[in-house]
């Protein structure tokens, strides 16, 4: 299939039929590379795919990024292009992000009304927060001399094509924690002879709920959630160990550092009270995504010229590894409404979500105008 504006929907649906998980995007990368070569772009292979388009003698270099990976979700949609890879699905719209960026590459390569260099970045493994860093480790920004970078994401429940962005924090960071409680197991009829790791675990869970509201302001956007409570007990056996796992979101690096400190303080205090050991593991996977003033102004100005409705949104609670790029060079991450009806309005990461094909020409034209 040739890459033409009228074919973008079918190209998007082809990506949808054959979704691939992070760092496994083999077919996806081959398809993208083929389309970019068809347009005459310089194509570079690595953990992702990069296409380079030059026009005129200007030194300006901008990067436009789309993510490629799918999610380990079993699709429940009934349309004729549902996933053929069982248990894997494009439930976050990355199929549409790729198609929009390919559409922009077509428009700019056939009508090069810009001066400078556009670097089309197709990134793997956004969902686990590993792809952007992997491309940076390969030298993406230095090798292509990228001066500004832009990222896009669809947002269900918002009218089709409505643009949302803001200067400053746009997406929260995400950190994961694991708390290992080393109690003393024993018989359920004689709990006083052991150190009940379940009761102690419950105490830790309760204490963690006081971090936001009692240590960090409830309006800060910080969230601490315990998502797993794991023990090896039986009906008449008190477990000797309990593991708690959870998720932390913050909009400020200082809050993230404070929460890590408070997690350790709570664990240490409860461990001391019960004369046991508690180990805490804390790792940040996604940094806070920060939009810089100049590129954000460029996005807003382009939106006005394109006739798009603009919403100055609040920071989002979800996370994006685009943060690795925008922490290194000036950048802007923005969202386009995916629609308010049917599967287009279903939440991201749900089994009945679908990207809105009506957004493809809007996003493609916007990318091209931004360049």
Predicted regions and their residues:
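Acidic/His- and Gly-rich active-site-bordering loop/insert found
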Residues: 1-90, 99-102, 106-114
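Divalent metal-coordination and catalytic microenvironments
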Residues: 15, 64, 94, 120, ...
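Residues that form or flank phosphate/diphosphate-binding pockets in enzymes
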Residues: 23, 59, 99, 130-131, ...
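Metal-dependent amide/peptide-bond hydrolase catalytic core
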Residues: 38, 202-371
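Conserved beta-strand termini and adjacent loop/short-helix elements that scaffold enzyme active sites
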Residues: 44-48, 123, 281-283, 313
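Non-cysteine beta-strand/loop elements that form the S-adenosyl-L-methionine
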Residues: 63-65, 74, 177-179, 333-339
């Amino acid at each position: 299939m040739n890459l033409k504006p009228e074919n973008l929907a079918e190209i998007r649906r082809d990506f949808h039929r054959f979704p691939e998980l992070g760092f496994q995007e083999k077919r996806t990368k081959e398809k993208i590379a083929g389309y970019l070569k068809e347009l005459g772009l310089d194509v570079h292979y690595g953990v992702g795919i990069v296409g380079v388009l030059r026009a005129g003698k200007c030194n300006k270099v901008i990067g436009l990024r789309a993510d490629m990976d799918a999610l380990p979700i079993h699709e429940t949609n009934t349309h004729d292009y549902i996933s053929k890879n069982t248990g894997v699905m494009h439930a976050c719209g990355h199929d549409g992000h790729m198609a929009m960026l390919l559409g922009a590459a077509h428009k700019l390569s056939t009508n090069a009304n810009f001066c400078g260099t556009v670097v089309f970045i197709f990134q793997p493994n956004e969902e686990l927060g590993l792809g952007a860093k992997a491309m940076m480790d390969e030298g993406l920004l230095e090798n292509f001399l990228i001066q500004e970078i832009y990222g896009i994401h669809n947002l269900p429940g918002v009218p089709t094509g409505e643009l949302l962005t803001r200067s400053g924090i746009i997406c929260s960071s995400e950190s994961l924690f694991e708390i290992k409680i080393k109690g003393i197991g024993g018989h359920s009829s004689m709990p006083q002879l052991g150190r009940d790791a379940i009761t102690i675990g419950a105490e830790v869970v309760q204490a963690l709920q006081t971090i936001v509201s009692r240590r960090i302001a409830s309006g800060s956007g910080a969230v601490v959630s315990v998502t797993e409570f794991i023990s090896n007990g039986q009906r008449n056996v008190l477990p000797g160990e309990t593991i708690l796992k959870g998720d932390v979101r913050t909009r400020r690096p200082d809050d993230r550092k404070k929460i890590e400190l408070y997690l350790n303080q709570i664990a240490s205090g409860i461990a001391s009270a019960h004369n046991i050991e508690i180990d805490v593991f804390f790792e940040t996977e996604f940094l806070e995504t920060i939009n810089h003033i100049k590129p954000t102004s460029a996005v807003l100005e382009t939106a006005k010229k394109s006739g798009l409705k603009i919403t100055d949104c609040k920071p989002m609670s979800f996370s994006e590894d685009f943060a690795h790029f925008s922490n290194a060079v000036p950048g802007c991450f923005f969202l386009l409404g995916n629609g308010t009806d049917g599967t287009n309005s279903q939440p991201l990461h749900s089994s009945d979500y679908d990207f809105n094909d009506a957004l493809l020409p809007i996003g493609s034209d916007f990318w091209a105008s931004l360049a």
